[in-house]
């Protein structure tokens, strides 16, 4: 996979090229990396296997990540399988109830490994996973025909206070840094607090989120 070449699991203390200037933040990170690795040995966020650095996955978990590929639904990227219709056809669920979007760019299919990565970032505080996950997402984005706005879904202020960060905002900022659009952090507004969506089905989630997020009138 092309995105794996950009995400090697190298030692955190690897010597940088002398031709690249180091920012104070990068210098501090390089200095503290061996100490961080000593206190918190690098582990795969999906299975717990030892790693060479704090960022990345073990080889076995990389192999278990399923990147959507052709043939797949032209609307939601649901895989058809080898015996299904050709690439770009529309799947039965999308035909039965056309979604209100122009298309989905899925970084991976939902399985045990991808679920653990999302939970590690969202509820485990593993914010160092954001750049890696953003690269997976960016690799699946279609070419932009004009200016692309990257608008993260906001958290309610109390949820943001409890968690300390908005995972959607972290991913959006990394995607902007990769050159895939312009970040607009205030494009949406959270109007009310909602319960945790964990364990809810699609219908229950839609019911809970109805009216909870609106477009910023500004």
Predicted regions located by residue number:
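Glycine-rich phosphate/pyrophosphate-handling loop used in enzymes and phosphotransfer proteins
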Residues: 3-218
